[in-house]
Amino acid sequence: TEAEIAALKQYTDNGGKVILCSKSDRDNKYDNCAENSNALLTAIGAHSRIVNGIIVDNDLKANEAYRLYLSSKENFNTGHPFTAGAYTSSNAFGTTPATDNQTGFQLYNGGPVEVLDESKVQVLVRGYQSTWGTHYDGYFDGSSFVPEYDESVDGRVTVKKGDVNVMTYEDLPGGGWVITSGVTFFSNYDIKSDQDYANRFILRNILNSLKPAGTVTKIADVHKAAEKEEFTVEGTVTANASGYDKNT
């Protein structure tokens, strides 16, 4: 509602941080997810938008054109703190992208993310060179659909091959930030501890960034304290770090 958007704008104007997750136009019968998402993104001064369409890939899909596992290093912005280590820590590390390779960043029923200003927005997760955007409604029903890439058909291609963004990050005018994702990347199925999808490591990086910084205690004071007390220290470890032998 307009009141909810106004409340979120006030929140971000005061430095609030937002994760916006949207979806594709699949089953968009009663509401337009892209339209609703973009109304909020516009209000808070963001430079990313959700494309009204669906992310597909005929070459590297799983059992459906819109179920993808992004398992290549090139899919991740390894230089950003939110995605740093997500690829190497995930079950995709050391594998080769293939239709039967269900590793990496799990994406199902996602909408593409458009970047309006590349100088202000960083792409965190992107598709393959064979990934593109189309419309669900009116083209197919279920997993039987094999979308035909044809730019000459009006409205068939919403995002060209190789240009699909899945998740972006940008700083907001109020001092906070917004992550714009075309998919809810942290559902229970995406962050299961026994699967090691990249989704879980990205979420962990984000949550760790939100934790308050601990009070740093001088190492000399820690030496004087009783055992089993917890402290935050800064220093350089050279050897025997695990032995806790003060005499070495």
Regions found by a protein language model. Give the residues of each.
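Short alpha-beta junction capping motif
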Residues: T1-T42, G175, S181
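Structured segments of extracytoplasmic/periplasmic soluble domains
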Residues: Q10-N14, L40-H47, N205-A213
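An acidic, glycine-rich "communication" segment
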Residues: S24-E151, G155-R156
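Surface-exposed, flexible loop/turn segments at secondary-structure boundaries
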Residues: R26-D27, F186, G243
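Extracellular and analogous surface-interaction loops
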Residues: P112-L116, Y169-L172, V237
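A generic secondary-structure signal marking the coil-to-beta-strand transition
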Residues: K120-Q122, G175-I179, E229
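Extracellular ligand-binding/catalytic regions of CAZymes and related secreted enzymes
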Residues: T131-G214
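OB-fold nucleic-acid-binding modules
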Residues: A213-T248
